């Protein structure tokens, strides 16, 4: 029997160690080390060690010790591969699972997890949600589509329960 999950969290596009991305996205941190520390602190303040968390890609680029970083983050961690996740990141021992795509049911919702926002997805017409990263909050979502990346989510993970259709520019409409 598996461990009890207290909460299910999602995040994407942390880009730990990626100084060029920090500047490009105008993230409000004075340095890459400061960004990394703030993102890790926000993650650990939100996610309990027993929680489940899905990272939807672009975990770390250029970080000096991604294995130690991952080990220091709370939760049972799963990775959906992003375009900036090489095999060295995908294969870290700290991931509970590591894959290109996932379909799962949590809290009564069928979820499609992929790094990229999809135009169409499995069970879309039956109410399934598409959770993604990659776009850093810059795309208008389709109904039931959510960018869970740190840029549009206050630089912290978000619980599935807090994703509300129609709640803002990075949330899908209830249609």
Model regions and ranges:
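A general structural motif
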Residues: 5, 50, 74-76, 108, ...
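A generic local structural motif
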Residues: 39-42, 64-68, 98-100, 115-119
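Active-site neighborhood of phospho(di)ester-bond hydrolases with catalytic His/Asp-centered motifs
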Residues: 11-12, 53-58, 77-83, 113-114, ...
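Glycine-rich, phosphate-binding/catalytic loops in enzymes
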Residues: 26-28, 70-73, 130, 146-149
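Short, conserved, surface-exposed binding loops centered on an aromatic residue
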Residues: 45-46, 68-73, 103
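Metal-dependent catalytic neighborhoods of phosphoester/phosphodiester hydrolases
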Residues: 57-73, 81, 86-98, 122-125, ...
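N-terminal active-site segment of His-dependent metallophosphoesterases
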Residues: 1-64, 152, 166-175
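Conserved beta-sheet core of the metallophosphoesterase superfamily
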Residues: 93-171
């Amino acid at each position: 029997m598996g461990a009890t999950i207290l909460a299910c969290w999602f995040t994407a596009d942390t880009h730990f160690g990626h100084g060029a991305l920090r500047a490009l996205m105008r993230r409000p941190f004075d340095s890459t080390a400061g960004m990394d520390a703030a993102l890790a602190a926000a993650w650990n303040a939100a996610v309990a060690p027993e929680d489940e968390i899905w990272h939807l890609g672009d975990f770390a680029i250029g970080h000096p010790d991604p294995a130690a970083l991952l080990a220091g983050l709370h939760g049972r961690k799963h990775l959906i591969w992003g375009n900036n996740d090489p095999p060295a990141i995908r294969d870290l021992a700290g991931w509970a699972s590591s894959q290109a795509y996932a379909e799962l049911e949590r809290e009564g919702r069928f979820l499609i997890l992929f790094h990229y926002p999809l135009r169409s997805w499995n069970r879309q017409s039956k109410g399934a949600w598409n959770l993604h990263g990659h776009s850093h909050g810059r795309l208008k979502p389709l109904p039931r589509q959510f960018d869970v990346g740190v840029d549009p989510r206050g630089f912290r993970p978000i619980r599935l329960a807090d994703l509300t259709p129609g709640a803002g520019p990075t949330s899908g409409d209830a249609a």
